[in-house]
Structures are given as C-alpha cells and as structure tokens.
Swiss-Prot record:
Outcome when changing T195A: Prevents ubiquitination and degradation in response to calcium
Zinc finger motifs (ZBR-type), residue ranges: 579-627
GO biological process, one term: regulation of mitotic nuclear division
Record pathway: Protein modification; protein ubiquitination
A single GO molecular function term of this UniProt record: zinc ion binding
Gene Ontology cellular-component terms listed: nucleus
Residues reported to bind Zn(2+) 1: C583, C586, C601, C606
TM ranges: none
Keyword match Transport: no
Signal peptide span: none
Full protein name: F-box only protein 43
Binding partners and assembly: Part of a SCF (SKP1-cullin-F-box) protein ligase complex. Interaction with SKP1 does not occur.
C-alpha cells in the first residue's frame, strides 16, 4: 500500500508539472503581440490538457468520499496509469510532435512550449488567465510538486541539454538579432517543423516527408545523415509535451531554419519566381517592388506561406493573358508612332527601310506571331502592288505611287504630273503616254480644251467646232494664243473665212475715210452703220445752235472733238444722285440733280445754271415763270421728227 501511494504521488507530481507547464505555455503565448488572447480559449491543446486534469481532479474528489487518508483508489489508479502508459507506448516510436486534426499551430508557439518545458533561460510571467485554471491549481496545491522528476524525464530525450532560443519577446533579443518581430513571425509562418535541434548532438531526427514548405534546403546537409541515424532509435522516451501539442508529419531542424533564414528571405527560389509573370516587367508602366516592401507585405499575412504562394499560381494564366494583351496594345502604339514619325524621316533620306525594325520584330515574335505576320503581309502587299514591273504601261498608277511616296516623305504635294513622274527615278515614262492619261488636269483653275485637242491630233473635232463660230470670232481666236492661231491656220475653211472678213474690213475702212464731214469721224469705227449715214450727216450740218444775246460764244463753231467722248469724260465724274443732260444753250453735257431739279453745264465757256423743268435760269423754290429761255422755232424741221411728220400729213 505504501509503494502504491508513493507511485501515485510521483504520478500526480508529474501531472502538476505538466499543468504548470501548460499554464506557462498559455501565458507566454498570450503575451506575444502577434497572437490574440482569444485563441487560447478555443485551442484544442487547452481542451485536451483540461480534460486530462479534470479526470484527475474528479477522481480525487470521489476518493475523498471513500477514505480521507487515500488520495485515489487503487482501481482508478491502475486504470489511469494503464491508459497513460498505453498512450505513451503508442507515441514513443515516432519521436515527433503529434498533430491534432482540427487546427495547426505556428512554429513559434511550439518552440515556446518546448522551451518552457525544457527549463531554458526564457523568462515568462506566469499569470492566471481563467477562473477554471485557478480552481484547478488550488485543488492540486495539496499535492507536493515534484519538479525534479519532471526535469529527469526530459533528460532522457534525444535532444541536447543546451538550448539557444531563436527569438524571444524581449527587446534585448530583438536588438541582437537585427530583425523585427514581424520578420521572425514571417519565418515561422514559412517554416513548418518540429522542435528537434540536431546542430550539436550526434543523434539524428526522423526523416522528412515530401517538402511542402517553399523554403528549400540543401539535400547534402549534415542533417540528412543524422535523420537516417535517428531513424533506428525507438526506445528513448519522448517529451511529456508530446501528448498535449499538435501532431506534425513534416519536420525541419531548427539549425537549418536559423542558418538559412536570412538567405531564404533575401534570395527566393528560382522555381517560385518563374511561376510569376516575368514579362510584366517589360512594360514601361511597370515598376518592380523592392525586397523590403515585398517582405512587409508578406508579414501581414498570418496564414501559411503555401496559401500566399498558391494564389499567384492559380491566377498565373489570367496574368499571362493580361500581359499579352498589354504587349499587343504597346506594339500597336509603337507601330503607329513608327509609321507616322520615324518611318517618314528614314525614307526621306532615300534609304528603303522596312516599316518594322529588327528589334521590334523580335519583340513582337515573343508576344504573338500573328502581329508580325499582319505587318509583314501589309508591307509585302504594298510592294507587290506598286512594283515597277507591274506598272510599265500604267501611268496613272505610277502617279499614284509617287504621290504616296511624297506624302510619306513630307514633300510639297502641289505638283504636276510631269514633276511627279520626273522625280521618281525608277520610272522612265515618255511624254506621249501622258496624253492618254484621263483626269490628269483635274483640279486646275484654267484648262485649254483646244490645246489639248491639238496635242491629241483631233483635227476633225476642231473642224466641227470652228464651223460653229462666225468669222469675227475666228479673228478673235487668232489673237488669244499661238496654239489657237495654229488651230485656225491648220483648218482651211476657217482660214479662208478669216481672210475674207479681213478684206471686207479694209474696204469699209477705206470708204469711211473719204467722208469729210465733222460728225463722220466718230462713226468710222462702227463700219456696220451705213443705212442713215448720209441723212445724219446732213442733219448735223444743217443744225445750228440758237443765236441769243446771253451767250456770245454760241455763234462759234462746235469743237471738232466728238461729243460722245465728252459725255464719257463727264460721266466718270458723276455722283450717285447726278445724271447727264444736254445743256439748253450749247448742247454740251450738263450735270443735273433730279431732286433739286437743277442742272449745270460742264463746259467752262458756258456754265449755264438752269432749271431742269422749264430750261431757264435756276429760280430756286419759285414756280417756273412764262419768260423761260425757250428755243426759237426752226424754219426747217428735222427729217424724221414729229414736226416733219405733221408737215407730211398736212401735205
């Protein structure tokens, strides 16, 4: 019975140490800035340890009713001890932290739990987090805590006794490590490993399963040999914390994590970088982020690194499609700019450079082969349509080709067809072929139809045109240009008509010069007025101005200059409200105003100011009087006048 009580007391001391360790674990994790206190209540670890302690305390309370001297009945002791040994025997050969199927914990929490149980130099402030844990501590205070047995049980573990913590929550360790707490949390989120440290011991941990972590380790490291060595060891007991923490199949030694932590952050693996779209960086609008910014963005992610990497891998196809579309748009913009600017400048120098450069073709070939085929097909189509072999007898297409070249070379577009065909060195076009070109004179302000017909040697069309024109128009055509004169001279009938008309003009001019009358000089230019010529001459000679005492100069003969020319001279000096009217005294042109009813003779010798109604001296606003300056009646009436007609009727 005494031996049974001693064994049971030792067992309860181990459970008390385990409870104390679990409280250390909860308080230390709750003090970390990266984890919230709400996780502790929902963690399966706390529920599992709580259930185990509840079974012990319930058994203790039931045992008080049976016997106050006995802590636990032998039956319950044997049952609980047997269950504990069976569980430890099942988990002993694995040498790794068991895993719970509900939720996995981060590496930092597992490291802190292992360091708290191993008695390292980490300082944790133990605080009671819940009323339930306080009640459990009070119920177990009567049992003497046996910390020595707990430390002795850990001494049999395959790990070395000396531990060096990777990261703590104190400021001192953060300054020594040179990195912030967020970066350590990043490394713990990226690494998924157990708490075995193999850097100093000869014993090797279990072999690793398939590598799920993105942080790659070298296969030739010393840890691989140690893993094979420790695979054969199955007899050493495991740590007591193996029953309370999560299980994990994948393990990464702490030495590799501490040694390769900086290297894995600064130099990512090539395989993962290749999964991303490297072609996005070729865009001018893309700017690559620095490593510090990428690290800071990753540290905000509290999940595993596999979830962080899996998203870009899933969307890699969408990113490739977007980048390809962006490349195509950029290629089209470059081709448009090249066609508008650089292509015209290069072609103006005389060098036939293709539209697409070699560098541009290589860039388009990477993005899409269709883009290059489109531009090459357009270029070959233009060269095939406008080659010199196909345009031998087609002057219109040659002119079009030269106009296109001039528009691209920024040359003046206002040029004739001869200039366009003469500037193109590859075409040698004779001048006769231009005569058959339809529409080459379109757009010109003036166009010589007769000259074009003469150049085309269309004499029958010219003959039909000249037959419709009278002799006077033919004479006028000869005075227009040499081409029209040649057209008239080449046509026999038009030329004979022209000669006959010139002879007639000469004879009429000779007959007109023989007349010696004064007024006949003004009518010599009009050769067709021969009907009443003699009558008009007689009338002018018989007409005499009235003799009166007012104007002594009226008796003088009229100046030999033509009155018609005098009228023209005075008419040039008229205002808009003035008109011409013959003076009642000298019959010279006089200016009169219809509104004022007043007229003034334009001749300096006369200068008569008269009224346009009564033809006497201007009297202003007064009514016209009877004593007006009327013309004296003539003895002989003029032929053809009203008086002469009345005389004839009377006779």
């Amino acid at each position: 019975m005494a031996n049974l009580l001693e064994n049971f007391a030792a067992h309860h001391s181990m459970t008390a140490g385990a409870k104390k360790k679990a409280d250390h674990q909860d308080t230390s994790v709750s003090q970390d800035s990266g984890y919230s206190d709400s996780l502790k209540g929902f963690s399966p670890d706390s529920h599992k340890s709580g259930n185990f302690l509840e079974t012990v305390t319930e058994g203790y309370e039931n045992s008080e009713n049976i016997d106050p001297t006995l802590i636990l009945s032998p039956i319950k002791y044997e049952l609980s001890w047997g269950a504990d040994t069976r569980e430890s025997k099942q988990l002993a050969p694995l040498y790794e932290t068991p895993r719970v199927g509900k939720k996995e914990f981060s590496l930092r929490r597992r490291l802190l739990i292992s360091k708290a149980t191993s008695g390292g130099n980490l300082d944790f402030d133990v605080s009671v987090c819940s009323a339930e844990s306080c009640g459990r501590e009070k119920s177990l205070r009567r049992i003497p805590s046996h910390e020595g047995s707990l430390s002795n049980s850990f001494a049999d573990s395959p790990r070395d006794g000396s531990y060096e913590p990777i990261a703590t929550s104190t400021l001192k360790t953060e300054s020594e490590s040179g990195t912030s707490c967020k970066k350590w949390r990043l490394s713990f989120a990226q690494q998924r490993s157990s708490t075995l440290d193999d850097s100093k011991s000869d014993s090797i941990p279990l072999p690793e399963v398939e590598n799920i972590s993105p942080v790659q380790h070298s296969l030739a490291s010393s840890t691989d040999d140690s893993i094979l060595y420790e695979e054969t060891i199955f007899g050493a007991p495991t740590t007591p914390t193996c029953n309370f923490i999560v299980k994990e199949e994948f393990q990464t030694p702490i030495s590799n994590l501490a040694a390769n932590f900086r290297f894995n952050l600064c130099t990512p693996d090539v395989g993962h970088v290749s999964d991303f779209d490297i072609s996005v960086t070729e865009d001018s609008a893309f700017h690559s982020l620095s490593l510090d910014k990428s690290q800071d963005s990753i540290t905000d992610h509290e999940g595993s690194f596999q979830e962080l990497i899996q998203k870009p891998r899933e969307t890699s196809k969408a990113v490739n499609n977007k980048s390809r579309l962006r490349k195509l748009d950029r290629c089209r913009r470059l081709s448009t700019l090249r066609e508008r600017g650089s292509q015209s400048e290069v072609e103006e120098e005389g060098n036939e450079v293709p539209v697409l450069s070699s560098a541009y073709k290589l860039k388009v070939a990477r993005a899409s082969v269709d883009e290059e085929n489109e531009f090459s097909s357009d270029e070959s189509r233009v060269h095939s349509l406008l080659s010199s072999d196909d345009l031998t007898g087609k002057p219109a297409l040659r002119v079009l080709h030269e106009m296109l070249l001039r528009s691209t070379r920024k040359r003046p577009q206002q040029a004739t067809v001869q200039d366009l065909l003469g500037s193109s060195g590859c075409f040698e076009l004779p001048e006769d072929s231009l005569s058959r070109l339809i529409g080459r004179k379109m757009g010109l302000e003036t166009f010589d139809i007769l000259a074009e017909l003469k150049n085309r040697n269309l004499k029958h069309i010219l003959a039909s045109i000249l037959d419709l024109v009278n002799a006077a128009s033919i004479c006028s055509m000869c005075r227009v240009s040499r081409d029209w004169r040649d057209v008239v001279l080449q046509d026999k009938s038009a030329h004979q008509r022209r000669k006959a008309y010139i002879k007639k003009l000469k004879t009429e001019a000779e007959q007109g010069r023989q007349l010696s009358f004064e007024d006949s000089a003004t009518r010599l230019n009009i050769l067709s007025r021969s009907a009443l010529r003699s009558v008009q001459i007689q009338a002018r000679s018989a007409f005499r101005t009235p003799t009166s005492s007012l104007t002594p100069g009226d008796n003088k003969s009229i100046h030999s200059a033509s009155k018609h020319q005098e009228y023209l001279k005075v008419a040039k000096t008229l205002f808009t409200d003035e008109a011409l009217k013959p003076c009642p005294r000298c019959q010279y042109p006089a200016k009169y105003q219809a509104l004022k009813k007043r007229g003034t003779c334009s001749r300096k010798d006369c200068g008569f100011d008269f009224c346009s109604l009564c033809l006497c001296t201007f009297h202003g606003s007064k009514e016209c009087g009877t004593g007006s300056a009327k013309r004296i009646p003539k003895k002989e009436a003029l032929p053809g006048s009203a008086q002469s007609k009345r005389n004839l009727k009377r006779l």
